[in-house]
Swiss-Prot record:
Source lineage: Bacteria, Pseudomonadati, Spirochaetota, Spirochaetia, Spirochaetales
Species annotation: Borrelia turicatae (strain 91E135)
Keywords from the named record: Cytoplasm, Methylation, Protein biosynthesis
GO molecular function, one term: translation release factor activity, codon specific
Region (Disordered): 284-313
The name this protein goes by in its record: Peptide chain release factor 1
Amino acid sequence: MFLERLSPIESKIKILEEKLQDTNLIKNQKEYAKVIKEYNYLEKIKEKKDEYENIISQIDENQKILSEEENLEMKELIKQELTHLNLKKDEIEHTIKILLLHQDENDNKNIIIEIRAGTGGEEAALFAHNLYEMYTKYSEKKKWKTELINFNETELGGFKEVSFEIKGKEVFKKLKHESGVHRVQRVPITESNGRLQTSAATVAVLPEVEETDIEINEKDLRIDVYRSSGAGGQHVNTTDSAVRITHLPTGIVVQCQNERSQHKNKDQAMKILRARLYKFEDLKKQEQRSNDRKQQVGSGDRSERIRTYNFPQNRVTEHRANISLYKLEEIMQGELDLLLDTLALKLQEQALKDNPI
């Protein structure tokens, strides 16, 4: 029964209220903020639960009156009231179901985005650069701050790979669904015959992770230093300032060469490594949770095509939600909300189907 799912809410709130009175908790600001967030979240559900129960009570009362009422006019008025109450009940029930879709603890975090050129050679690298510009322009519109961490540029100005940070309110919540393979269809500037080509780039969106959020053993790291290189592979630094870090247990490799100092490059590489390891562990947990439903959550949505950008038709197709918008130019200029808002709604509806409450 729907209300049975909500029954433990009040006892959980009482436990959190007791925790919040603990003076030791207040000293630990990070843990205190976490408990406050959970408390506010449960209070929001309780508020809707109380509202829902009140509506149910009104429906029961009106149905009882209707069964005893003999006046036809009064009966009609009661029926109208019942219709209104049932609509209200459905609305509140839907709101509660959305709230019960577990809130992502990373939603308020800053992010690191990694974009890599896939199939398509130079054209794929140019498209990777286009995606980077799309996200930075979107960030400007949102008043978010972006910072370039690392990039490997081609001779024509494309990116073989690029990593950058975005800081702001609910950045991860807004952009977390961007992870995956982005495909482009257009005539490349390198194509003299004017033939349409399909290329791809891979996007990974990683929540930024504090040092205290994940433990990394120094013994598990192999750190190599080398000279940084620019477009075409030529060396641009006479000192070994570039850093490559390999996490031996997982085989994850991170490199950074864009800062002039080796120390700064190591710090940036460690920041990316923490984010990747956190994502790696999170995907393993998701895979375990989704095995019963036989979903491919844990396989990493980066391995599947999520979106196609067709330049000749000015069309963007979002494959996960079966959305096509003929507004490619606006989207590439950072008007991503045209797509993201509809996508979030579709994915929310799908989540409700996959997790019936």
